[in-house]
Each structure stands twice: as structure tokens, then as C-alpha cells.
From Swiss-Prot:
Modified residues (N6-succinyllysine): K513
Main location, first listed in the record: mitochondrion
Domain of life of the organism encoding this protein: Eukaryota
A Gene Ontology molecular function term of the record: ATP binding
Pfam families cross-referenced by the UniProt entry: ACAS_N, AMP-binding, AMP-binding_C
EC number of the protein: 6.2.1.1, 6.2.1.17
Name of the protein in question: Acyl-CoA synthetase short-chain family member 3, mitochondrial
Residues that hold ATP according to the record: G420, E421, R422, D441, H442, W443, W444, Q445, T446, D534, R549, R560
Organism per entry: Mus musculus
Example GO BP: small molecule metabolic process
Keyword Nuclease: no
Reaction catalyzed: acetate + ATP + CoA = acetyl-CoA + AMP + diphosphate; propanoate + ATP + CoA = propanoyl-CoA + AMP + diphosphate; butanoate + ATP + CoA = butanoyl-CoA + AMP + diphosphate
Subcellular localization, as worded in the UniProt entry: Mitochondrion matrix
């Protein structure tokens, strides 16, 4: 079905232009009449959802819990719909929740076409900055539409239709975003897998998703080396069961062409040259937009399924309400498209809201140096940056005084957001000092697709919250701290972080082909709640402190000690640049904490001296109950591509147990180095 844009303009929110809606406002979560709302760059959207005081945050959070249908129905008016929804919230079959039932939309239209129809086609949609290829490009909304609509035509020509899956195996290039949007345009379900991901893991995901087409690129570029994607893909297809009908290959410019397999492979440029543009295909609100596989799973792959309608509503709302951005401002999420941050806040979120998104093919250090982030912020006039604490630590480790950043003027830079792992106070304070903007930690998960807790600065939350917190509950997320018996804990008591159902729009609707695991993993331990599997506590003001995964709570002689709390204490000692704490088995206490530390470059003291000081420091800040006495010093910690430390793997290594190095680890050789250090320490 080809959409009528006149119809799309007239059918928005949950009703036709000026027409009364069937059903009561309380059921529909809306006023009795509505007018078309096609949000443009100049529009303010829902006034009450964009600016305000701390009191406004409280009002919004209370409303989202008391009457979620009305609250999110109002937010959904900012998205264009082909067909009105008949019910805002359907939760008859818990734990599953459906939002905007029977409503029809297209997220690609909302992210691209509607801005052009609003006269904003020449505005910049994507800034591509690739220090690894020495390339910079600005791409307008019109140019994105031209590429995306043609690519949609290419996919349709190859037999891809609504509901089919497409695997995307590409580096951080604009063509990856075009492919995501092209799939969304025709109702195909994309599954984006890291470019350069190991063949075995790639094969598992291809077999599970069963894509009609795989879209890939010839090469990825890492600092100092090229990654050949085609041999990795060929090996994945050789060892796997599923065979895609076609493999579409984008050959990167100024690099050698890769040979095509006759009858299967297609050349991107050749297909695009003869492609016909394709219109958007309306899909139901609950239609899966994408499958995103999470790492470290056993058995069936854990493919998070994202419903289209709720995701579009939530992401658009967060850009103003959480991140405080106005349409047209430049936003940079320094992540990878393969992570949920890349899906939500490199691709869909900023484009839905009419922002310019920075696509950065580089690293915080080494491309070429620790001044890279400062350069990108200054050159492109970035208003807000979202990165992981590990990126900040890497910059600090190489350039403790941020001397390389001082040459850049960050006149438009307003806010730095961090997430992906717990941000220690030392890193937070250093970031504030060198970037000279508020630095706000927030917390969310692949499953939720957007923040669970944050400082919602668009709703008037403080830009100077207490150190160590990860924000307050985002409207829609009714977070509680429970013990293992489902009893609510008092302020500052460490417990299980859970979310009272229903989950708000945008949260996952299931696991691909594995709904039993969806129910068992997330909803059985605490009936009526979503189990985040994280541990933490809330203070008296409602700020959440996420300490560690539940598995990372160390039981020391019956005392539950958060590994994250010890890490923060160690990092606050001036000699340590990075740290991971794991529980080491102990015949007397059950477990004792062991710290793996990376020292700062300018430390002159001996390791024995440093250890003595750190032990004393931890005893002063946490107390003798932590039983902290041991640390080893390593040159580097293993990290995933999203900057997370694989603590369960390190725990197995430290305790002499078999361990598996997941393919998301950037440098697996570090485990061998740590093993050697541990042997010498015994």
C-alpha cells in the first residue's frame, strides 16, 4: 500500500482532523478533538513536555504513573499516524504490554519525510566524521530521503516485504543508517550486527533471524588496520544453516573492490543507480522495527524485539524532556550503531526530533589523539554529547590535564550525558572540570531502549545532582528497590532494582522466537515487575544509585558489598586510572574483593606503596566490612565495544575457572596478560 501523505497529515495523534474520537478521553488518553500535529523544526511540540521546573518533573512523573494512557497519548500526538489507535494501552496479557493498539504509522516517514514536508529538507540530518579515513560530510534531510527511498526500492526489488528480516553488517558509515531507515520504510525488520563481529557469532545470529537479505560493506577501519568483512561473512554463511537470497555489498571508496559471487551478491552502487524510489509502508504500532541481539547469552540467542509505535513516541519525547534539545540543534551519541545507544540515539531519536546527528567513525583516543572528542564538539557545534564513562577515562589516562582539548572552543556545548556503565565520581568530576558543562549520568538497558532513570533537564530536573547517582525515575518508569522476598526497602538500602508494570512505550515487546525466555528471565522472579537484574539503592530525594549487576554483588562473610562501590573508592584514589573489582573465593569469608587496577601514567610510587594506600583509602571510605586487602596491577582492562567490563568473565578467570571471551571484547589478548599477572601475584 502506498501511503497518502495528505491522509498522513490529516490523521495524526489518534483521530482525524477536527473529528470527535470514539470512546471516552480516559480510555483514549486524549482530548475529545484533535488537530493534526506534524512536528517541525520550529515547533515546540507538547509545551508541558519540553520545559519547566523541578515541580514540573514531579507533576509529569505522577501523571505518567497515575494515568499512563492519557500521559503517553498526549506525547503520541507529536508523531504522525496513518490510522488512529483504538486503545492507548492494552495490558490484558501481562507481562506483555501493547501501546497505541491498531494505530498505524511509519517511523521512516516520521524521521525523514515529514521534516522535508515542513520545509526543512535542506537542514543537515547527518554529520559524518571519520578520522580513520580522513573524511567529513554533511548530509541534508533531502539527501537522506533520496538514498533511503532508493535503497528501499532495491530491497523490494529483491523480494523483501513487510515482516521479512534483513541483517545489516556494516561499519560506522552513513550507508548503515540508510539501510536501517530503508528497512523501516518498507516494514522490514532489521537486525544490525557489529561490523567485524566474529564469524561464529554472526552465523548464530543469521541462523536465528533468517534474513532474506544481508547488507554489508567491503571493509571496516580500526586504528592502524583494515577489517575485511566479506571473508568473515563468507565463513559465517559456510558454518551456518541459513542462506540469504541476496548479499548487498557496499564497496568503500578509495579501497579495492571485493569479488562478487554470481547469483547471490549485488553491488550497492550498481543497484542504486537503477533503483526506483519507494514510498513508506504503514505498519501497526506493535510491528517489530528491529531485532537487537545482546551479548553473553547461552542457548538460543537473546534477540530484543522493538515495537515501532511506542519506540517512535518515546524517543521523540526523550530528546526534549530528558536531553533538553530543541529541533535543529546538533547532537552526538559517541557510540556504535551496533549497540542500543546507536539504534536509539545515533539513528532514530535525533532524526525523529529534527536534530542533526553526528556519526563518528573513530575512537576517543588514537584517532589521532586524546583531543579527538574536543575537536568534534568544536567543529560541528555540538550542543549535547552522550558517551560512556570508559571513553572519558581513556582520554584522561592519556591526557590527564586535557591539554589537547584546550585549543578548541566549545561555545555551543551545553551538556555531557554518560551511560553504559556506572560512572565513578572521580571521572564525573574530571569531566566537569575539562568540558566545563554539567555532566549527567543516567541509566538504561538494551531491553528498555531509552533511559529508565535520568536528570530530565527538559522537565526542570537539576543539572547538579548529587555525585554517584544515575538520575530520578523517567516518567513511565516506576522504579522500586525490593529485597529477594519482594519487600520494599527503605532509602539507601541495597537491593534489587525493579520496575512496576506496565512498562512505558518503547520498551521491548519480547525476545525474537523465544517468548518463554522473555517471561522467565524478566518477569518471574518478581511478579508484577520487570526485573532489571541490577542492584542499587534510592536516596531520600528519589535519586537512584546503580551499584552493579545483581551477579556482581560480593557476599563477604554474609555482608552484601557492591563491587561498584569498591571500584568507585579505588578510582577516587589519585593513582588509579581504571579499575574492576570481582569476588575472589575465600575459605573463611566465602568471597573477598580483588581489584584489578590500571595505574595512571605519571605514578612514580611502587606498586606495593600504591596497594597499601588504596587499601587504607577503601577502609576509610567503605569500612573494614569490605575486607579489601588485595589488588593486582595490569596494563589494561578488557572492555566490550560499548565500554563495559566483562566482570563475570574476569571473575571466572580470577577464580581459576573456565571462561569464555565474548566476541564483543575489543582486545581478547588482555585476558592472557591478566592471567600472567595473577600467576606472578600468587
Amino acid at each position: 500500500m502506498k501511503p497518502s501523505w495528505l491522509q498522513c497529515r490529516k490523521v495524526t495523534g489518534a483521530g482525524t482532523l477536527g473529528a470527535p474520537l470514539p470512546g471516552s478521553p480516559s480510555v483514549r488518553g486524549a482530548a475529545v478533538t484533535r488537530r493534526a500535529l506534524v512536528a517541525g523544526f520550529g515547533g515546540r511540540g507538547c509545551r508541558a513536555l519540553t520545559t519547566g521546573s523541578g515541580g514540573e518533573y514531579k507533576t509529569h512523573f505522577a501523571a505518567s504513573v497515575a494515568d499512563p494512557e492519557r500521559f503517553w497519548g498526549k506525547a503520541a500526538e507529536q508523531i504522525s499516524w496513518y490510522k488512529p489507535w483504538t486503545k492507548t494501552l492494552e495490558s490484558r496479557y501481562p507481562p506483555s504490554t501493547s501501546w497505541f493498539v491498531e494505530g498505524m504509522l511509519n517511523i521512516c516517514y516520521n524521521a525523514i519525510d515529514r521534516h522535508i514536508e515542513n520545509g526543512q529538507g535542506d537542514k543537515i540530518a547527518i554529520i559524518y566524521d571519520s578520522p580513520v579515513t580522513d573524511t567529513k560530510a554533511t548530509i541534508s534531510y533531502k539527501e537522506v530521503l533520496e538514498q533511503v527511498s532508493k535503497l528501499a526500492g532495491v530491497l523490494v526489488k529483491q523480494g523483501v516485504k513487510k515482516g521479512d528480516t534483513v541483517v545489516i553488517y556494516m561499519p560506522m558509515i552513513p550507508q548503515a543508517i540508510y539501510t536501517m531507515l530503508a528497512c523501516a520504510r518498507i516494514g522490514a525488520i532489521h537486525s544490525l550486527i557489529f561490523g567485524g563481529f566474529a564469524s561464529k557469532e554472526l552465523s548464530t545470529r543469521i541462523d536465528h533471524a533468517k534474513p532474506k537479505v544481508v547488507v554489508t560493506a567491503s571493509f571496516g577501519i580500526e586504528p592502524g588496520r583494515k577489517v575485511e568483512y566479506i571473508p568473515l561473512l563468507e565463513e559465517a554463511l559456510r558454518i551456518g544453516q541459513h542462506r540469504p537470497d541476496r548479499v548487498l555489498i557496499y564497496s568503500r571508496p578509495n579501497m579495492e573492490k571485493v569479488p562478487l559471487m554470481s547469483g547471490r551478491d549485488l553491488d550497492w552502487e550498481e543497484e542504486m543507480a537503477k533503483a526506483q524510489s519507494h514510498d513508506c509502508v504503514p505498519v501497526l504500532s506493535e510491528h517489530p522495527l528491529y531485532i537487537l541481539y545482546t551479548s553473553g547469552t547461552t542457548g538460543l540467542p537473546k534477540g530484543v524485539v522493538r515495537p515501532t509505535g511506542g519506540y517512535a513516541v518515546m524517543l521523540n519525547w526523550t530528546m526534549s524532556s530528558i536531553y533538553g534539545l530543541k529541533p535543529g540543534e546538533v547532537w552526538w551519541a559517541a557510540s556504535d550503531l551496533g549497540w542500543v545507544v546507536g539504534h536509539s540515539y545515533i539513528c532514530y531519536g535525533p532524526l525523529l526530533h529534527g536534530n542533526t546527528t553526528v556519526l563518528y567513525e573513530g575512537k576517543p583516543v588514537g584517532t589521532p589523539d586524546a583531543g579527538a572528542y574536543f575537536r568534534v564538539l568544536a567543529e560541528h557545534g555540538v550542543a549535547a554529547l552522550f558517551t560512556a564513562p570508559t571513553a572519558i577515562r581513556a582520554i584522561r589516562q592519556q591526557d590527564p590535564g586535557a591539554a589537547l582539548g584546550k585549543q578548541y572552543s566549545l561555545t555551543r556545548f551545553k551538556t555531557l550525558f554518560v551511560a553504559g556503565e556506572r560512572c565513578d565520581v572521580e571521572t564525573l568530576e574530571w569531566s566537569k572540570k575539562v568540558f566545563r558543562v554539567p555532566v549527567l549520568d543516567h541509566w538504561w538497558q538494551t531491553e528498555t531502549g531509552s533511559p529508565i532513570t535520568a536528570s530530565c533537564i527538559g522537565l526542570g530536573n537539576s543539572k547538579t545532582p548529587p555525585p554517584g547517582q544515575a538520575g530520578k525515575c523517567v516518567p513511565g518508569y516506576n522504579v522500586m528497590i525490593l529485597d529477594d522476598n519482594m519487600q520494599k526497602l527503605k532509602a539507601r538500602s541495597l537491593g534489587n532494582i525493579v520496575v512496576k508494570l506496565p512498562l512505558p512505550p518503547g520498551a521491548f515487546s519480547g525476545l525474537w522466537k523465544n517468548q518463554e525466555a522473555f517471561k522467565h528471565l524478566y518477569f518471574e522472579k518478581f511478579p508484577g515487575y520487570y526485573d532489571t537484574m541490577d542492584a542499587g539503592y534510592m536516596d531520600e530525594e528519589g535519586y537512584l544509585y546503580v551499584m552493579s549487576r545483581v551477579d556482581d554483588v560480593i557476599n563477604v562473610a554474609g555482608h552484601r558489598i557492591s563491587a561498584g562501590a569498591i571500584e568507585e573508592s579505588v578510582l577516587s584514589h589519585g593513582t588509579v586510572a581504571d579499575c574492576a573489582v570481582v569476588g575472589k573465593e575465600d575459605p573463611l569469608k566465602g568471597h573477598v574483593p580483588l581489584a584489578l587496577c590500571v595505574l595512571k601514567k605519571d605514578v612514580n610510587a611502587s606498586e606495593e606503596q600504591v596497594l597499601e594506600e588504596i587499601v587504607k583509602h577503601v577502609r576509610q571510605s567503605i569500612g573494614p566490612v569490605a575486607a579489601f586487602r588485595n589488588a593486582v596491577f595490569v596494563k589494561q582492562l578488557p572492555k566490550t565495544r560499548s565500554g563495559k567490563i566483562p566482570r563475570s568473565t574476569l571473575s571466572a578467570l580470577v577464580n581459576g575457572k573456565p571462561y569464555k571471551v565474548t566476541p564483543t571484547i575489543e582486545d581478547p589478548s588482555i585476558f592472557g596478560h591478566i592471567e600472567e599477572v595473577l600467576k606472578q601475584a600468587v
